[in-house]
Amino acid sequence: MNTARNARTARVAYSGAIHSATPLDGGSTARLRLADGRSVAEADVVWLPPFAVGSIIALGLNYADHVKELAKELTVGSQDEPLVFLKGPNSLIGHQGATRRPAGVAFMHYECELAVVIGRSAKGVQAADAMAHVAGYTVCNDYAVRDHLENWYRPNLRVKNRDGGTVLGPWLVDAAAVPDPHALQLRTWVNGKLIQQGSTAHMVHRIPALIEYLSSFMTLQAGDVVLTGTPEGVVNVDEGDEVVTEIDGIGRLVNHIVGDAVFGR
């Protein structure tokens, strides 16, 4: 994976093909420059996840304040070891995409997360060397349907593997452009109201430790992505809501909540 030429890149569908794209105006998504030199408007493209995604590895309960928030509902145990789980490829969508709220659901919430993108193979990597395996970062909004959550340590597939429930983008930001990924502010707005606010400084298990842990029992490949968890401040979202998740220096990710009727079933 090579992001060296541009600190900020995207992938979009335009005119029947998939293109790499960069912003024409700083970090704005309003107009894009395609790899072939054409300039296009955001309204004319479909945003995809900003890189070819391999394995999707997600963290649960990786912010202490979020643990306290959820412990009011369920028993949460020790965090000596990261709580990790895998997500399916059909859960992925890009910036400005639509996420379905299933009929009859009582509680579905967003999760603003820093997504760490692996740039080269990692197996048996020590924490001190782990950051050399990171290509870059993007924003993730990792939805959860809490109705089906019975045990945080055995996440039900219906909670975290819904089609279109893992929103990535808009940009892949080169690791060299992010001096300290543990000093970033995360924010979420629902219909223009700021609801969630936190900092990556409060991760329980930091990125080098996560890469060391994961690579101790599995090989991480270029394109794999590690979703590092969310801080406190999650609330229910409903059909018609606009959800915006933002991480300083990484991007501002827009997503829309829709009902079953939009999908024809």
Functional labels for PLM-detected ranges:
Residues 55, 81-83, 95-99, 106-114, ...:
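Generic beta-strand structural signal
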Residues 47-48, 72-74, 99-108, 122-129, ...:
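A generic local secondary-structure boundary/capping motif
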Residues 83-101, 123, 164-171, 232-235:
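Short catalytic-site patches enriched in acidic/histidine residues
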Residues 76-94, 110, 244-248:
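Structural signature of FAD isoalloxazine-binding scaffolds in flavoprotein oxidoreductases
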Residues 62, 111, 115-121, 125-141:
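RNA pseudouridine synthases
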Residues 2, 25, 45, 49-50, ...:
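Catalytic-pocket segment enriched in acidic/His residues
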Residues 1-82, 176-179, 194, 244-246, ...:
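N-terminal non-catalytic cap/leader segment that marks the start of a structured domain
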